[in-house]
């Protein structure tokens, strides 16, 4: 586990925690960017005339797209690039064949002002890291599984019966 920082699309720096594991089967990580103080962090940074008061919110809402863009620009052949969700927490998945023929499987989700970037890079010829990708779920402070009954454009209602 490593504490770090993450530079957002709009130039703000956010606290980040990176959980990682490496072995001969690949490199695995989950990066969690904490956007809970976005309004304060944006208000305290140096501004230009081009800055807009609500960029703190736009920075959070656009964080999935920005993280996906950062993964795409690393290079390699993108073989999968699509919207995804876990328990109706919206996100995005990418699969990339890297220059060395290793494969990167990435999933990005935004929940409760936290951006989750899960990445697994496995050597050429390895099986896809399906368990790693499919084991991610969101839990509340009491350890209960979170599943929503509707999407973000509607009022979110928590489905209390899923545990």
Give the label of every model feature segment:
Residues 1, 53, 57, 61-72, ...:
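Surface-exposed amphipathic alpha-helical segments
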Residues 1-39, 44-109:
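Signature of long, low-cysteine stretches enriched in small and polar/charged residues
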């Amino acid at each position: 586990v490593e504490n770090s920082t993450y530079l957002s699309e709009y130039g703000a720096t956010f606290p980040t925690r990176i959980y990682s594991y490496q072995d001969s089967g690949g490199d695995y990580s989950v990066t969690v960017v904490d956007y809970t103080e976005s309004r304060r962090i944006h208000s305290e940074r140096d501004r230009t005339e081009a800055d807009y008061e609500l960029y703190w919110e736009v920075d959070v809402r656009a964080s999935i797209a920005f993280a996906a863009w950062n993964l795409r620009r690393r290079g390699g052949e993108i073989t999968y690039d699509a919207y995804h969700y876990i328990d109706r927490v919206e996100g995005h998945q990418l699969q990339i064949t890297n220059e060395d023929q290793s494969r990167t499987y990435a999933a990005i989700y935004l929940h409760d002002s936290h951006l989750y970037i899960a990445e697994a890079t496995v050597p050429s010829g390895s099986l896809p890291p399906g368990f790693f990708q499919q084991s991610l779920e969101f839990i509340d402070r009491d350890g209960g599984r979170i599943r929503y009954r509707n999407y973000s454009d509607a009022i979110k209602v928590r489905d209390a019966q899923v545990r």
